[in-house]
Amino acid sequence: MTLKHLNIFVATMTGTALMVAEDISDFCNDNGVNTNVLEMDNLEINELIKSKSPVLVTSSTYGQGDVPDNGQKFYNAINKNSPNLSHIEYSVFGLGDMTYRDTFAYGGKKFDKLLSSLKAKKIAEPFYHDASDGSLPEEVAVKWFQKNVLKFI
Protein backbone atom coordinates (compact mmCIF):
# COMPACT_ATOMS: atom_id res chain seq x y z
CA MET A 1 0.00 0.00 0.00
CA THR A 2 1.35 3.40 -1.00
CA LEU A 3 1.17 6.01 1.72
CA LYS A 4 -0.49 9.27 0.81
CA HIS A 5 1.50 12.41 1.46
CA LEU A 6 0.95 16.18 1.40
CA ASN A 7 3.41 19.06 1.71
CA ILE A 8 1.94 22.14 3.36
CA PHE A 9 3.91 25.33 2.68
CA VAL A 10 3.16 28.19 5.08
CA ALA A 11 3.53 31.97 4.68
CA THR A 12 2.48 33.78 7.85
CA MET A 13 3.07 36.93 9.87
CA THR A 14 1.09 36.34 13.06
CA GLY A 15 0.85 32.55 13.02
CA THR A 16 -2.73 32.14 11.78
CA ALA A 17 -1.70 30.47 8.50
CA LEU A 18 0.54 28.12 10.50
CA MET A 19 -2.34 27.26 12.84
CA VAL A 20 -4.49 26.49 9.77
CA ALA A 21 -1.71 24.30 8.33
CA GLU A 22 -1.29 22.42 11.60
CA ASP A 23 -5.04 21.73 11.89
CA ILE A 24 -5.15 20.47 8.30
CA SER A 25 -2.09 18.34 9.06
CA ASP A 26 -3.78 16.84 12.13
CA PHE A 27 -6.87 16.06 10.06
CA CYS A 28 -4.71 14.45 7.38
CA ASN A 29 -2.79 12.35 9.88
CA ASP A 30 -6.11 11.13 11.34
CA ASN A 31 -7.21 10.14 7.82
CA GLY A 32 -4.18 8.24 6.56
CA VAL A 33 -2.26 11.09 4.93
CA ASN A 34 1.27 11.91 6.07
CA THR A 35 2.18 15.59 6.01
CA ASN A 36 5.13 17.93 6.18
CA VAL A 37 4.28 21.42 7.44
CA LEU A 38 7.05 23.72 6.24
CA GLU A 39 7.27 27.44 6.92
CA MET A 40 8.49 29.23 3.82
CA ASP A 41 11.37 31.01 5.54
CA ASN A 42 12.95 27.54 5.82
CA LEU A 43 12.21 26.51 2.23
CA GLU A 44 14.41 26.45 -0.83
CA ILE A 45 12.92 26.46 -4.32
CA ASN A 46 14.26 22.93 -4.94
CA GLU A 47 11.94 21.59 -2.25
CA LEU A 48 9.04 22.66 -4.45
CA ILE A 49 10.62 21.62 -7.73
CA LYS A 50 11.51 18.14 -6.42
CA SER A 51 8.21 17.56 -4.62
CA LYS A 52 6.53 14.31 -5.60
CA SER A 53 3.55 15.00 -3.33
CA PRO A 54 0.71 17.49 -3.71
CA VAL A 55 1.36 20.91 -2.22
CA LEU A 56 -1.04 23.01 -0.19
CA VAL A 57 -0.07 26.64 0.29
CA THR A 58 -1.52 28.39 3.33
CA SER A 59 -0.82 32.11 3.18
CA SER A 60 -2.00 35.16 5.00
CA THR A 61 -1.82 38.64 3.48
CA TYR A 62 0.30 41.44 4.81
CA GLY A 63 0.52 45.18 4.24
CA GLN A 64 -0.91 46.29 0.92
CA GLY A 65 -1.72 42.80 -0.36
CA ASP A 66 1.75 41.36 0.04
CA VAL A 67 2.97 37.85 0.68
CA PRO A 68 4.03 37.68 4.36
CA ASP A 69 7.68 38.42 5.13
CA ASN A 70 8.58 34.78 5.77
CA GLY A 71 7.29 33.85 2.29
CA GLN A 72 8.83 36.69 0.27
CA LYS A 73 12.20 35.03 -0.44
CA PHE A 74 10.55 31.76 -1.49
CA TYR A 75 7.92 33.54 -3.64
CA ASN A 76 10.57 35.73 -5.30
CA ALA A 77 12.83 32.73 -6.00
CA ILE A 78 9.99 30.90 -7.74
CA ASN A 79 9.05 34.03 -9.68
CA LYS A 80 12.66 34.78 -10.70
CA ASN A 81 13.60 31.22 -11.70
CA SER A 82 10.27 30.40 -13.38
CA PRO A 83 10.68 26.62 -13.15
CA ASN A 84 8.37 24.31 -15.05
CA LEU A 85 6.01 23.01 -12.36
CA SER A 86 3.80 20.86 -14.58
CA HIS A 87 4.50 17.85 -12.33
CA ILE A 88 3.20 19.68 -9.22
CA GLU A 89 -0.38 19.36 -7.97
CA TYR A 90 -1.48 22.13 -5.63
CA SER A 91 -4.17 24.17 -3.99
CA VAL A 92 -4.23 27.29 -1.81
CA PHE A 93 -5.94 28.31 1.41
CA GLY A 94 -5.54 32.07 1.68
CA LEU A 95 -6.33 34.35 4.57
CA GLY A 96 -7.51 37.91 4.30
CA ASP A 97 -9.95 40.49 5.58
CA MET A 98 -12.70 41.92 3.37
CA THR A 99 -12.35 45.20 5.23
CA TYR A 100 -9.40 45.57 2.86
CA ARG A 101 -11.46 44.73 -0.19
CA ASP A 102 -8.92 45.92 -2.79
CA THR A 103 -6.22 43.56 -1.53
CA PHE A 104 -8.35 40.80 0.01
CA ALA A 105 -6.33 37.57 0.40
CA TYR A 106 -3.72 38.72 -2.11
CA GLY A 107 -0.99 36.69 -0.38
CA GLY A 108 -2.77 33.45 -1.30
CA LYS A 109 -3.96 34.79 -4.64
CA LYS A 110 -0.40 35.68 -5.64
CA PHE A 111 0.78 32.13 -4.92
CA ASP A 112 -2.13 30.69 -6.90
CA LYS A 113 -1.44 32.93 -9.89
CA LEU A 114 2.30 32.20 -9.81
CA LEU A 115 1.98 28.41 -9.50
CA SER A 116 -0.68 28.32 -12.21
CA SER A 117 1.45 30.44 -14.56
CA LEU A 118 4.27 27.89 -14.16
CA LYS A 119 1.94 25.07 -15.24
CA ALA A 120 1.32 23.53 -11.81
CA LYS A 121 -1.96 21.58 -11.77
CA LYS A 122 -4.65 22.99 -9.50
CA ILE A 123 -6.37 20.04 -7.80
CA ALA A 124 -9.01 22.17 -6.07
CA GLU A 125 -10.13 25.76 -6.35
CA PRO A 126 -8.45 27.91 -3.71
CA PHE A 127 -10.41 29.12 -0.72
CA TYR A 128 -9.96 32.60 0.69
CA HIS A 129 -11.04 33.00 4.30
CA ASP A 130 -12.45 36.35 5.40
CA ALA A 131 -11.35 37.26 8.93
CA SER A 132 -14.13 39.85 9.17
CA ASP A 133 -16.90 37.23 9.02
CA GLY A 134 -16.20 35.96 12.54
CA SER A 135 -15.55 32.33 11.58
CA LEU A 136 -12.47 30.48 12.81
CA PRO A 137 -10.10 30.02 9.86
CA GLU A 138 -8.79 26.64 11.03
CA GLU A 139 -12.32 25.20 11.25
CA VAL A 140 -13.26 26.58 7.83
CA ALA A 141 -9.98 25.29 6.39
CA VAL A 142 -10.43 21.72 7.61
CA LYS A 143 -14.00 21.57 6.26
CA TRP A 144 -12.90 23.01 2.90
CA PHE A 145 -9.95 20.61 2.75
CA GLN A 146 -12.08 17.57 3.59
CA LYS A 147 -14.68 18.43 0.95
CA ASN A 148 -12.44 19.72 -1.85
CA VAL A 149 -8.83 18.58 -1.55
CA LEU A 150 -8.56 15.28 0.33
CA LYS A 151 -10.01 13.20 -2.51
CA PHE A 152 -7.15 14.29 -4.81
CA ILE A 153 -4.33 13.20 -2.54
Predicted feature residues:
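FMN-binding flavodoxin-like domain, especially the glycine-rich phosphate-binding loop
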Residues: 2-5, 15-19, 29-31, 38, ...
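Local sequence-structure signature of Cys/Sec-based thiol-disulfide redox active-site neighborhoods
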Residues: 6-10
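Short, solvent-exposed amphipathic alpha-helical segments in soluble enzyme
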Residues: 23-25
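Short acidic active-site motifs
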Residues: 43-47
